Amino acid sequence: MEKLLDILEKENSHIRCYRTKKYSIDENTSDIIEYDDINRKPSELKKTSFAETEQTNAPTVNISNHLITTTQGKPLFTYFLDGSRHCYMIDDILIGDKIYPLGGGEIIVGCCSRKDGKFKSEKIFQQIVISAPKNIDDKEDGEPYLRSLLDKFNYSIQKGPKALQTLGISIDKVLKYAIDGGQSNLDKKEFKSRLVAKIQNEMTDHEQIMVRELCNEGKLDDDNWLIKDGSIEYNQNFSNIENNIKSIVEKTNYKHVVGISKSFNPDLIKDYKGKKLSKTIAELKPFERTKVYRYEYQTGRGDSSYFGIWYLRLRKNSFRETNFSDIVKCEVLLDGETGKIDTEQVDLLSANIINEAYPTCYGNDTRWANHLYPVYLTEKFCKSRYRDSNIILNLF
């Protein structure tokens, strides 16, 4: 079978492949994002206003045992969505007088549903991509050139070993990362970050597309909410989708969606007194939440989206590893700058989120204290779909 690098050199006289070591970038901890909201800009406001209807100046709210118990019979959350990606370093390639990293990735976005006590897969999106420097296309032919390359790659795969054909593997897309941006001294490390970012952007684009599909199919309503694993604060500067079709982030799609982050920056916003909220978060008692605070997020389209953010402690655990163990960050999209979420709705959502934390995945995931069990199952479902890394790397 003719490998991708061989085809790339054959089709591009201006490219030289060095055939350096191939490896999984994800195995390098320096490439792993520590917080779900690591790229979120801390609020510059001296104080942050409440984004719930109850405006009492109390720092925390207790979720009553009665509410937690009464919501167990009919869960509010029906759908659970997670995105995952593996990134690979394929080679160092010479274009002109500069060396660039060439990467690949496998992207999986999955949604599971729970209906009548049965948990099953609802939707799955999966693709293999190449992440290459923008000048891989020396003639700037754009999509026709990239499609021609993909056709040649995939034809070679189809003519390869039968075992590979049985898996139905194909390379679906070539992503092109920026190589300039007004900086002439960019190094390999920066290019590598851009390579990974392009794959990450593709994954988050398809998370949003899947949310849109659920809305268009009429599956999300007042009685059937979606938990999205991670933040729902999407910046359109970090998207691979053309500007004229970025309607995937229509705000109406998120009316019945809650973003739940297991890891977060506790200093993202200040409280109503202008003090760091991290102290209040760390001191939350079992089944207690912070007030809902308004957070303005620049969308990258010249406007802002406004989110209601609160933090919730999920468990009665006297032996937690850190003060932030078993606390999750919860996000909902607000209706404009002055929008608020009804306090009773926040408490109802919080009670349901607490119930989703049981049973636990203790012993199976080091993040068990901050995990919601249906989200854990959805994550496991997505990751079970990954092809073996050696198979992916051997394509190239």
Predicted features, each with a name:
Residues 83-89:
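Short acidic, Gly/Ser-rich segments with clustered Asp/Glu that frequently serve as metal-coordination loops
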